[in-house]
Amino acid sequence: MSKSTIEPKNKKSVNRGKEIAKDTILTPNFYTTDFEAMEKMDLSINEDELEAICEEFRKDYNRHHFVRNKEFEGAADKLDPETRELFVDFLEGSCTSEFSGFLLYKELSKRIKDKNPLLAECFAHMARDEARHAGFLNKSMNDFGLQLDLGFLTANKDYTYFPPRSIFYATYISEKIGYWRYIAIFRHLEKNPEGKIFPLFNFFENWCQDENRHGDFFDALMKAQPRSVKSLSNKITIGGSTFTHPLFDYFHRFRYFLNNHPFVSKLWSRFFLLAVFATMYIRDQGTKKDFYSALGLDAREYDQFVINKTNETSARVFPVVLNVFDDSFYRRLDSIVENGKRLSEIDKKDNQNLNKVLSKIPIFISNGYQLLRLYLLKPLDSKDYQPSIR
């Protein structure tokens, strides 16, 4: 991707970058991880599958797919102000999310290329895809006289640290949920072309295949992880400061032993599935319903379809998945959405900050309770869940 596709071209683009640099729990985050642990990963258990996936990446099926055509000319001017605002918000979030993936994958490919070349090459190919997506979205923003300052975001947005295994869980789910989100929108608009508010959606069918291949890579990578890990690192980072001692190696061994224990793997599977599903559902139902309505979609039905399909797909790699069919699953998520509306109403009031905080405490407790109950729902064993997909 050429550098010009991600650089700001006007004053407005800089402002957009600064706005999105402000983190909230529902905005796309930027991530970093333990690069030393990543470069020491032994892939031999599943190297053949990883090599096959890397060969698929090398073919770059979408190399010539993301080419704008005449349909884009004047398309932005046809949108009414309300739909325009909704679509620009969608473009901002999507572009930031894709760029976040690019930064993580690119940094991984650079840091581990000397000691783990196969893994580094896979990450480099995925960084290529994510950069292409972000650049294409940013060009659509330019149709509206805006462009994200991705360079500003790179330098100023906070980075959240996750250990490698957590990155694998979260990114696998995110890539697979991205596939189902894009293909669901594409298929809907294929049957209901009157909802196609912008030509960008014509590209979603091939686009989602990139997401699917990325998810397959993380599937293969998780299968490649051994039950025991040799010397990992004698370093530990606390509050941004790095400390070195030989004993820290045993800490890392114990941590990796726990992460690879079957019982702990089940807990992590449930945690990350719930985290990704709840974030998407709460965001969409709380602030994105009008956008989906503009496409002719019912936001609740759309989210339920995407969550159910992603949950089903995740049964191929995780030992357990969430029981999304339990009557209380979406009911509890809806309760959190309603609590979000109550929080917004409190923020609109002219009360003093202390009164606002006190008013919010019961709502936060309610949200925590609902999430805990969702986490404690008896999961579905992947061996018994939709065996036809395995």
Swiss-Prot record:
Keyword Lipid biosynthesis tagged? no
> What EC class is this?
oxidoreductase
Q: Kindly tell me the pathway this chain contributes to.
A: Porphyrin-containing compound metabolism; chlorophyll biosynthesis (light-independent)
Q: Which InterPro entries match?
A: AcsF (IPR008434), Ferritin-like_SF (IPR009078), Rr_diiron-bd_dom (IPR003251)
* Organism domain of life: Bacteria
Requisite cofactors:
Fe cation
Citing just one GO molecular function, the answer is:
magnesium-protoporphyrin IX monomethyl ester (oxidative) cyclase activity
User: Biological process GO annotation list?
Assistant: light-independent chlorophyll biosynthetic process; photosynthesis
Q: Known EC number(s)?
A: 1.14.13.81
- Pfam families reported in the protein's UniProt record: Rubrerythrin
Tell me if Signal is a UniProt keyword of this record. no
The protein's UniProt keywords, in alphabetical order, are: Chlorophyll biosynthesis, Iron, Metal-binding, NADP, Oxidoreductase, Photosynthesis
Q: What catalytic reaction does the record list?
A: Mg-protoporphyrin IX 13-monomethyl ester + 3 NADPH + 3 O2 + 2 H(+) = 3,8-divinyl protochlorophyllide a + 3 NADP(+) + 5 H2O
What family does this belong to?
Answer: Belongs to the AcsF family.
Function (record text): Catalyzes the formation of the isocyclic ring in chlorophyll biosynthesis. Mediates the cyclase reaction, which results in the formation of divinylprotochlorophyllide (Pchlide) characteristic of all chlorophylls from magnesium-protoporphyrin IX 13-monomethyl ester (MgPMME).
- PANTHER family associated with the record: MAGNESIUM-PROTOPORPHYRIN IX MONOMETHYL ESTER [OXIDATIVE] CYCLASE, CHLOROPLASTIC
This protein is called: Magnesium-protoporphyrin IX monomethyl ester [oxidative] cyclase
